[in-house]
Amino acid sequence: MCVRALCLSTVHVSDQSSKLTKLQTNVSASASLHISDQSSKLTKLQTNVSELRVAFSAGLTDSGSVGPFDKETTLIFSKIITNVGEAYNPTAGVFTAPVSGLYVFSFTAADYLKGYMGLYLYKNDKPIVFSLDLNDHGGYASTSNAVCLQLEEGDRVHLGLPASYRLYDDSRNFSVFSGFLLFHL
């Protein structure tokens, strides 16, 4: 009887050992899958964070006066101060949203001759903000404005100079256009 109990006990231990091995294999596989999933999520988050770095500032020109023109003209702020994410195109004067989000844009413009100076800020060719000044004293004057815009990926923002208006800029950056992503939506 003892021998039979010993045999049954050995079978039971062997069965338990087999079950334990299977359980360890399942736990190990599950842990590996979980770690792989977490690693994938971390990589995606790191990618998203790097995509969210968007900011630019650009001066208008070193050449002095810009305008007046016979018709409204898109201004090309070609003097890049900062262009993190390369979303501002200094050749076309247009910012293109690389991701959907809430963006902040600001601009300052100056002139020193008597007359009107001012700028429109456009989103997808629709005027959003206008800022102007009548420089009636003939010294340096400036105007500025800022706006928060909800943009979808691919939306475009630029500044336009109205017909018969003029601006001034030189190496001191009197006239500057800036924007940055506040947060991703």
Report the location of each language-model feature.
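Noncatalytic modules at the cell exterior or secretory-pathway interfaces
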Residues: Q150-A163
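C-terminal helix/juxtamembrane-tail motif
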Residues: A163-L185
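Terminal beta-strand-rich extracellular "head" domains
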Residues: A109-E153, D169, L185
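Beta-rich globular "head" domains
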Residues: N83-Y120
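Extracellular beta-rich ligand/substrate-recognition surface
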Residues: K79-N89, D133-Y140
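Extracellular, disulfide-bonded carbohydrate-recognition/adhesion ectodomains
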Residues: G64-G67, N83, L113-G118, P162-Y165
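Assembly "stalks" and propeptides
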Residues: M1-T82, E86
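Exposed beta-strand and adjacent loop surfaces of beta-rich binding modules
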Residues: A55, Y116-G118, V176
